[in-house]
Swiss-Prot record:
Family to which this protein belongs: Belongs to the class-II aminoacyl-tRNA synthetase family. ProS type 2 subfamily.
GO process terms (BP): prolyl-tRNA aminoacylation
Protein known as: Proline--tRNA ligase
EC number of this enzyme: 6.1.1.15
SUPFAM superfamilies per the UniProt record, alphabetical: Class II aaRS ABD-related (SSF52954), Class II aaRS and biotin synthetases (SSF55681)
Job of this protein: Catalyzes the attachment of proline to tRNA(Pro) in a two-step reaction: proline is first activated by ATP to form Pro-AMP and then transferred to the acceptor end of tRNA(Pro).
Enzyme class: ligase
Length: 445
């Protein structure tokens, strides 16, 4: 993409009401624009990152055996009355009446809809297990939306729902999602710690939140320090084998959100192992048995010929929220430092002397060669000063900057800058193109 043709409305300063770094930088980098309280338009740069985050989530769900479908944003109120949750959400639920006076709602979550889909189609234990997932926009009418995409009213969520015959099968489904979450957050450069959590209005008796530590986190969290540096399991997993040891390894050490915190148990840890911090929730998983299947009569015929309600689980990831969490965890005074897997562009080509024949030719060569190699390239071909070009590339977080100037061209070299480390080195253009072409930022962990 040539910057001269791109839509990138960057700001020199963030609006005064942007309180946290991620909100400030997303506005300054031209990623989002507020349309109403807690509601944002996703501009081209922000949408590019959102789609890359979504792609990783989708790949890890598919790898773990979940099956994608797409459920409506507008849901029947009667389904929520059937589950008994219609009044639980109170004013956070946006309720709608259509022209036929039917009660509808803008879905804050989708347990009722997916249970309705399941019960209409699956009747026998022989058709289990199933795990269905949905990536869809949700709406919750927050009393005080703030912090940009971190606590908006409209947001993109991935919700997966598992259906099993018995508690043993349900626990295996829970473990698969637990491990899949470790991998997907790791691929985005996040160190997410699973913590025992309150089930809230979703319900159930087993729940973990996945927390990214950050000074601007909305809640206090407490954990053993070793959990922060534990490596993700990676893709080479027998998803239908015994994953309990992997889960045990990450749940044996103390970790809890503020609601579940046990001060005595935490104090029993050696002082040097205790970590108290603020955290951002990026994922939440639940096992809730028959909370929805029983009242909604999602039944299957078991091996004994008797009908039983299925055991269910729910597994959520705040896809749009993840962008804010990544920025909170990875930025500097110059702007965003995207992990390469989710960066809007892999490489920024900077022409320091637009209109100089040799510089123009070298930039065109690099731009076309890197595009042909499958890299996402942003070519700053604007006739502006070099300092402004560097500032823009740093602000939007392009991981690699290929800098072409008349002095370097005369010496037969270009400069390559690493956004994360700030390191620069000079090399012949062909060598730099080969290095950048060989990288695969989207590769699985």
């Amino acid at each position: 993409m040539r910057l001269s043709r791109y839509f990138l409305p960057v700001l020199k300063e963030a609006p005064s009401d942007a309180q946290i770094v991620s909100h400030q930088l997303m506005l300054r980098a031209g990623m989002i624009r507020q349309e109403a309280a807690g509601i944002y338009a996703w501009l081209p740069l922000g949408l590019r990152v959102l789609k890359k985050v979504e792609r990783i989530v989708r790949e890890e769900m598919d790898r773990a055996g979940a099956i994608e479908l797409l459920m409506p944003t507008i849901q029947l109120a009667d389904l929520w009355r059937e589950s008994g949750r219609y009044d639980d959400y109170g004013d956070e639920m946006l309720r709608i009446t259509d022209r036929h006076k039917r009660d509808l709602l803008y879905g804050p979550t989708a347990e009722e809809v997916v249970t309705d889909i399941f019960r209409a189609s699956v009747k026998s234990y022989k058709d289990l297990p199933k795990n269905l997932y949905n990536i869809q926009w949700k709406f919750r009418d927050e009393r005080r939306p703030r912090f940009g995409v971190m606590r908006g009213r409209e947001f993109l969520m991935k919700d997966a729902y598992s259906f099993d015959l018995d508690a043993e099968g349900a626990r295996k489904a829970y473990n698969r999602m637990f491990v899949a979450y470790l991998n997907l957050f790791s691929r985005m450069g996040l160190k997410a710690v699973p913590m025992r959590a309150d089930t809230g209005p979703i319900g159930g008796d087993l729940s973990h939140e996945f927390i990214v530590l950050a000074e601007t986190g909305e809640s206090a969290v407490f954990c053993h320090k070793d959990l922060v540096e534990m490596a993700a399991p990676g893709p080479d997993i027998d998803w239908y084998g015994d994953l309990q040891p992997l889960v045990n390894e990450r749940t044996a050490l103390y970790a809890a959100t503020e609601e579940m915190h046990d001060e005595a148990a935490f104090a029993a840890l050696p002082e040097g192992d205790r970590l108290s911090a603020r955290g951002i929730e990026v994922g939440h998983i639940f096992s809730f048995g028959t909370k929805y299947s029983e009242p909604m009569k999602a039944l299957v015929t078991g091996p004994d010929g008797k009908d039983v309600p299925v055991q269910m689980g729910s597994y959520g990831v705040g896809v749009s929220r993840l962008l804010g969490a990544i920025i909170e965890a990875s930025h500097d005074e110059g702007g965003i430092i995207w992990p390469e897997s989710v960066a809007p562009f892999d490489v920024g080509v900077i022409n320091m002397r637009q209109g100089d024949a040799a510089c123009d030719e070298a930039c065109e060569t690099a731009y076309k060669a890197l595009q042909a190699a499958g890299r996402d390239v942003l070519y700053d071909d604007n006739d502006t000063r070099g300092g402004a070009k560097f500032a823009t590339m740093d602000l939007i977080g392009v991981p690699w900057q290929l800098i072409v100037g008349p002095k370097g061209i005369a010496e037969g070299v270009v400069e390559l800058k690493n956004r994360k480390t700030g390191e620069r080195h000079s090399a012949p253009l062909a060598e730099v193109i080969a290095q950048l072409s060989a990288q695969n930022p989207g590769k699985a962990a």
